[in-house]
Regions:
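N-terminal glycine-rich anion-binding loop in soluble enzyme alpha/beta folds
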Residues: 1-54, 176-226
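Cofactor- and metal-binding active-site motifs of prokaryotic enzymes
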Residues: 53-161, 172-174, 322-327
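Extended hydrophobic packing segments that form well-structured cores
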Residues: 30, 355-460
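C-terminal catalytic subdomain
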Residues: 283-399
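Short Gly/Thr/Asp-enriched flexible loops that form oxyanion-binding sites at enzyme active sites
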Residues: 82-99, 266-277, 411-419
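N-terminal small/polar loop signature for handling phosphorylated ligands or for N-terminal nucleophile
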Residues: 50-97, 209-252
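Peripheral docking tails and interdomain loops at the edges
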Residues: 2, 107-149, 153, 280, ...
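A charged, amphipathic alpha-helical module
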Residues: 154-270
Length: 460
């Protein structure tokens, strides 16, 4: 699902209302304003325009208060029209920004109109009071994209605010790097963590009807898989588990969830691979092993791509070829498979769930991807961010690559990554790589999100 930001658009400048310079040219160039609005709207940003050019305190107060109290507005683009007395605007912008909405100043080049001078005076005033803002200069596509990325990041931060992570179980498989401080999640992101006992899921699983199971087979399995799964108890329990988790998170109104899976349900009922695969397929952010850092990463990526998100073990590196192998623990949104459709397998590891369960066998389709991971270093949030290219090895090599891990029946992604792998191994924040299909728009938006939320950014 691609998030669509909504930004206020306010032109500022004191030399307004048709005032002309000594050459008889209006200080404020309406053509530049119109072209800039059209350019940013073409990037998918919805604008809420102000009717007048803002120059004075009462105008700024009225314009920004209206945007502040509109919950659908994510931030404001302050478009430089000409020189401005910064003191007339600063207080109203400060009040707006403290409501959790982003502020960016956009200046189009040109000597006529004295636009840059107004921008620098205003931006320096924001610095004086310690206010977070962005300022960009240009009218080219790269600059417009910077404005769009910042706008999307504002929308992403606002969408994350006041969400709830549902938790089923506790730390899975000793994954210390996935644990969370609930107070920190609330303080930094406005996210609540609310736990439920896994018995709620088991009870819901028992109540699933045969009609519901058949509906899943017809509408979720048939369209995405080469063949139907075996008609056995393992398949039935896997489908029941998926439906049960879906019902519980809908009942509790969880925006995303984490599940322990093992030890726990994977020993007593079924592994959660099929459940996780179908949730990711439907764009519901989730993470196994109660990995809170991963579910936060999945949430961010899910809102920036039309495709499902994938995560798996950072399983092997070939430093010479600069490629990596990422193997999911049986879970993968089936629509990511390509060119061949996904298949079914059994989970296959009794030491990670003796009850068994359906897993997804797939090789990920080729394409550009952005990979990220939110984690913590000494309690402080950071995000590792890099780009890659998923590719499909030649048939013989593909068979060997899948076989050598011993888990050929689990999802595989083969990714070209031109990075410093020694540095990566040192700083990586988990066993997982989490990725989404996308390019510069996604990458730039995640960078701006880190800026807005004071997350340390590590680019590889």
């Amino acid at each position: 699902m691609m998030i669509r930001p909504k930004m206020g658009f306010i032109v500022f400048g004191v030399h307004k209302d048709g005032l002309k310079d000594p050459l008889g040219v209006p200080f404020i160039n309406q053509k530049i304003i119109d072209e800039s609005k059209a350019a940013i709207e073409a990037k998918g940003v919805e604008l809420v325009e102000n009717e007048i050019v803002v120059a004075y305190k009462h105008e700024a107060r009225e314009a920004l208060a209206r945007l502040k109290h509109d919950d659908s507005v994510d931030g404001v683009i302050l478009f430089s029209g000409t020189w401005v007395w910064a003191s007339e605007i600063v207080a109203a912008v400060r009040d707006f920004e403290r409501a959790g909405k982003g502020v960016i100043i956009w200046t189009v080049p040109g000597s006529q109109g004295w636009r840059l001078v107004g921008t620098l005076a205003l931006g320096a005033s924001f610095k004086e009071i310690g206010m977070k803002y962005r300022s960009v200069y240009g009218s080219d596509n790269d600059t417009v994209e910077k404005v769009a990325c910042f706008s999307r990041a504002c929308a992403l931060r606002n969408k994350l605010n006041m969400t709830t992570i549902g938790a089923f179980g506790g730390r899975g498989m000793g994954l210390t790097c996935g644990c969370a401080d609930p107070s920190q999640f609330m303080r930094e992101f406005g996210v609540d963590i609310d736990s439920r006992d896994s018995m709620d899921i088991l009870k819901a699983a028992e109540e699933v009807t045969e009609e519901e199971i058949q509906d899943v087979k017809e509408n979720l399995i048939k369209p995405y898989f080469q063949e139907m799964p075996p008609d056995d108890g393992c398949t039935e329990r896997s489908i029941r588990l998926y439906l049960a988790v879906k019902k519980v998170i809908e009942k509790e109104k969880f925006d995303m969830y984490v599940i322990q899976s093992f030890p726990g349900l994977a020993e007593e009922y079924a592994a959660s691979c099929f459940t996780q695969s179908m949730m990711l397929q439907q764009g519901i952010p989730t993470a196994t092993l109660c990995d809170y850092n991963n579910v936060l990463t999945v949430f961010l990526l899910s809102n920036l791509t039309p495709d499902p998100v994938y995560y798996g073990d950072f399983q092997c590196i070939d430093k010479e070829k600069k490629v990596v192998k990422v193997i999911g623990d049986g879970a993968c949104a089936p629509s990511l498979a390509g060119p061949d459709k996904a298949r079914f397998a059994h989970h296959g590891l009794p030491t990670e769930g003796s009850a068994g369960g359906l897993s997804v066998e797939a090789v990920l389709k080729p394409g550009k991807v952005v990979m990220g991971r939110i984690g913590r270093d000494n309690g402080m949030f950071e995000m590792i961010l890099h780009r890659g290219q998923v590719y499909t090895p030649d048939p013989d090599d593909l068979k060997d690559q899948r076989t050598e891990s011993g888990m050929w029946f689990w999802p595989h992604a083969f990714i070209k990554m031109d990075v410093d792998y020694d540095y990566g191994v040192q700083v990586w924040d988990s066993e997982y790589i989490t990725l989404a299909y996308g390019d510069e728009e996604m990458y730039g938006t995640l960078k701006e999100f880190c800026y807005l939320t004071d997350i340390k950014l590590i680019e590889m």
